Design a protein with these regions (language model features):
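Glycoside hydrolase catalytic-domain groove-lining segments
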Residues: 117-163
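Aromatic-lined carbohydrate-recognition surfaces of secreted/lumenal glycan-active proteins
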Residues: 62-99, 147-163
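Hydrophobic faces of well-ordered beta-strands that scaffold small-molecule active sites
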Residues: 1-7, 37-39, 78-80, 112-114, ...
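Substrate-binding cleft of extracellular glycoside hydrolase catalytic domains
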Residues: 1-86, 169-178
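Alpha-helical scaffolding within the catalytic cores
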Residues: 19-26, 91-103, 132-144, 179-183
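Substrate-binding cleft/loops of secretory-pathway carbohydrate-active enzymes
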Residues: 84-113, 165-173
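Substrate-binding cleft of secreted/luminal carbohydrate-active enzymes
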Residues: 116-117, 151-232
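Aromatic- and acid-rich polysaccharide-binding/catalytic face
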Residues: 37, 41-48, 97-132, 199-203
Length: 232
């Protein structure tokens, strides 16, 4: 499993085939490699997948990346991070229907890798809201996965989303994390469950880029050897 971030295959908001090819050669030098690859294309082009004016162009860009990878690494299974999109407060019929419009992309990907990061602690919102958030987002992915015969691998994280001003980047308590994972694994739509999860890990990156985050400062204050440090 590997992730390609937007800087590894996109230039100025457009697919950069030279850059994508370099990334493939760097991460998967053997052309017959078997692996899972998640493309993380966040930003305007991603947002435009749900716009009226730029939908076709964005869809074309997203699909062309998959076609290129399939041509050059035919044994790699590829999908997009955040497809279908995530919703916490407005997981309604409008959100569901908008995601169903991405049928051309669902037909192309090998799997769905919807993001189910945790935003709030149970002390900030009622635990049932966190449970419903997980259930509704996984159910939508499973519904789409069943329709297009695609496995679902929700992307999870052991930290709260950085948008949370009080708890952002703090480790999710172990028992809460177990509940989080179990809720994902137990969600079912017409007999279909997730095929697994993709566990995002970027502690080294955030340690370098979020040096002023109060929660990371507290966590790392007594760490002497980061190479041996393990999330507990």
């Amino acid at each position: 499993l590997d992730f390609f971030f937007v800087v590894e295959f996109v230039t100025n908001g457009r697919i950069d085939f030279k850059k994508l090819n370099e990334s493939l050669n760097n991460k998967f030098p053997m052309k017959d490699t078997k692996a899972y690859l998640v493309l993380d294309w966040e930003g305007k082009v991603y947002d435009d997948l749900w716009s009226k004016n730029n939908y076709k162009e964005s869809m074309s860009q997203f699909i062309s990346a998959i076609d290129f990878i399939k041509k050059n690494r035919p044994n790699i299974k590829v999908g997009y991070y955040g497809i279908p999109s995530r919703e916490f407060w407005n997981a309604d019929a409008v959100w569901q229907n908008k995601n169903l419009l991405l049928a051309p992309l669902y037909k192309k990907v090998d799997f769905l890798a919807n993001s189910v990061y945790m935003f709030y602690t149970d002390s900030e919102v009622k635990s049932v809201l966190n449970t419903n958030y997980i259930k509704q987002n996984v159910e939508l992915a499973l519904t789409i996965g069943k329709k297009f015969n695609k496995p679902v691998y929700p992307v999870i994280w052991h930290r709260y989303h950085p948008s949370n001003q009080h708890f952002g980047l703090m480790n999710i308590p172990l028992q809460s994390f177990r509940t989080y994972i179990n809720d994902i694994l137990e969600t079912e739509v017409q007999g279909k469950k997730v095929s697994g999860v993709f566990w995002w890990q970027a502690d080294i990156y955030y340690r370098k880029t979020e040096i002023n985050n109060k929660n990371l400062k507290k966590e790392y204050s007594e760490i002497k050897n980061f190479d041996e440090y393990d999330v507990k």
